[in-house]
């Protein structure tokens, strides 16, 4: 094990709520759940498909009685500081600048969706102190409706089965989009032979089918298409194997927590001699998984970090024999200013696992070990350093035998040289070969003042919260390699991997903020395409194209008029991942618009407004919303995009959309 010595929607959603509730210790919270017979969450199962288990057991639940916990009282105690009610004349957030959904707008979600978010999704840390009955009571109150006499099994699990169980094709012989960035370099570029779409085709695209995710408040994960199958993870903890042309379902796998990002597919051979293709992914409780791509059979599960705040929000990377697993700890980032919490102890990391067995080969932390600091003013113990989470998928450089990761900000002093940085790790040992810090001294925690005393769990001086949310993209100009990535500061960077990450160029594409340029660029042979988020500014949105060689501006496109008008959470911000094909670049916006631009001059080629309800092939009530965390996927003449990844900053939705030519 190696130890180095030295938001966006999810950021705001979880950290704001962290500040708003009276957290007990993590151990106390688990003890309380154990006392109520709940214990740790551990459910996982194959549902449906070739090797389907018996019908899902339906949990019985009774109507709320006078003896049940008061959802209103619990909501007011732990939620209302941020999710307060609208005042007369208000149309958006309950808390200006934070934009957490007000109580009135939470009623758009079912109690099942809210309960899933509290139990398995992004709010599980905030609900850690609640019993199952208390979480249900909050879900009923927040949604404004009851569960009814029973909790139905998810609508999308037992329906929409494919009539034929086709054998998967050879991944190398059929078009694919594998993983978050469409390959280990994470360029998000799809060549014509794989995409089978040209810029001239895009205006003729039509909606072919829609798939609704049940019991979720957001559609954040991006799909993966390999071997003639589409793999769609969900925040409800399911992975769906679908027919990419019809949306029918081959199988569904139930993980132990919500899955917030894309899967990657690679070959495996287990100890029993079984072999084939595996779907690799991670969840919000820091579990990594391998599931057979043909049948949905579980191959292995590995918890890669025991810290209660640990979560996997970046996709896993696969190099043929290993999977690389990034871990971040957002749930602790909001605790520095909270009295009574012993902040902070989480450390970001990457683990290399044997792809066949899930065995940990090595684990490298991004920062040094925690040490006790001066107690807080209330006598609570405090620790540091902390933070340095890895939000995004690792990037693999087979030529140099390195894996690159981008790190987040620190949570607590002392500042480290490896936060807000790109690190190069040896693929065999995890040893850090070099690091390049882009913003020094960026220790930041929600609820802290700009300047804080020595006996505070907060950093002495708050940094700007400019962590790196997107992965480094490995590309080249001639015989020179570059690592290109955006930062929340509003800067795009090109680093030289041959010179230990020395900066080759930088370009300011946005004003920058804690919700600045966010989730990823696309790179083709000539250009870097960057979307502008700037969600905290009066004029968010817009697109830029830069030369790969030196970062010179080629064209820029101002934001278009918002498709969502004055709707709460509506923004023109374009911080989501971009996708490039020959002649065009696609991007989903916070206003719910999926747009395609010409790579020549930035002119608009096509727009589709996802702000509506959809008739889903699986019968789930589906609707679109903001698009931010997940990017478009182009493969085999189709375009796939998840709409509704607004978190608590934008507008929620729960739909996967598939477009094709007439």
Segments predicted by a language model, with ranges:
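Extracytoplasmic/lumenal domain signature
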Residues: 199-214, 239-259, 265-275, 280-310, ...
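Short, solvent-exposed loop/turn elements at domain surfaces
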Residues: 90-91, 184-191, 215-221, 240
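Extracytoplasmic electron-transfer domains, predominantly the class I c-type cytochrome c fold
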Residues: 96-146, 177, 402
